[in-house]
């Protein structure tokens, strides 16, 4: 989605500058890649100091709830050039907590800066306000709330190309990236597999590297990493996703298998929860809700067992396909975006030096 936000923002800025409308806008990629030509629907000045443009999201083939999502972007001059770009979350754009800042990835901000700043006149700053008219209603069909994102959709893309996490083509792309990473002369034998955009953003903030973003095809990627000679692999993801691995589910798309609360309830039995507590877990609305129903000490014990079980089941999974020296570690984050639970291997191989 950030690509279409950037294209609409550029069209609006051009309108504000008095330039004629162009149906395709050049979006500059932060990594220096070939600029993208991204279509926009319309653009117009609203007054002497602000303009509006509209684009429509095209996520490519596959299922995506943002397909044909209309994106409005209003731009306006700011009083001071020192402010640079000022991002204002409009209606339908997710915020970090009620009244908080817009939820956007580093990539999304860099995309806007690379695309817009070269067009700004000297001494001029710009306010950018994306608006997603259907964002609030569509957000109810996502896991945004589980990460503390409220009021709309998060702008958390990390690349211009759309990835379909459940498609075979996505698996092939990840495997190509894995092979390239391992073939790099500077590769040191370890890699962090991150699940989803939130995981990727959090891993970067934690200073973990090298990183490889994966979708739902975790099993084949683990085996491929072992075959490629990776020695230490860290799985980093939201507890509601990685818990499936603790249940032996290694293709994690929700259309294929779930079982999250059942797995958590079984683990609760292992840590000695009472029958009443187990019933509360089984009746919870989500994994996050289940942990919230426990006292902090019990929740910590259960989370640590969950992380350890993810490590154990993942190790057992690759052992079915060969005898490799790969060590698999796991760290899980919760809705507060905190790396909350680490398995024993994660503590030993990835976090000892950081701590």
Curated annotation (Swiss-Prot):
Pathway: Cofactor biosynthesis; adenosylcobalamin biosynthesis; cob(II)yrinate a,c-diamide from sirohydrochlorin (anaerobic route): step 6/10. Keywords: Cobalamin biosynthesis, Methyltransferase, S-adenosyl-L-methionine, Transferase. It catalyses: Co-precorrin-5B + S-adenosyl-L-methionine = Co-precorrin-6A + S-adenosyl-L-homocysteine. The gene is cbiD. Its EC number is 2.1.1.195. Belongs to the CbiD family. This is Cobalt-precorrin-5B C(1)-methyltransferase. One of its GO terms (molecular function) is cobalt-precorrin-5B C1-methyltransferase activity. It is an enzyme of class 2 (transferase). One of its GO terms (biological process) is methylation. It comes from Parasynechococcus marenigrum (strain WH8102).
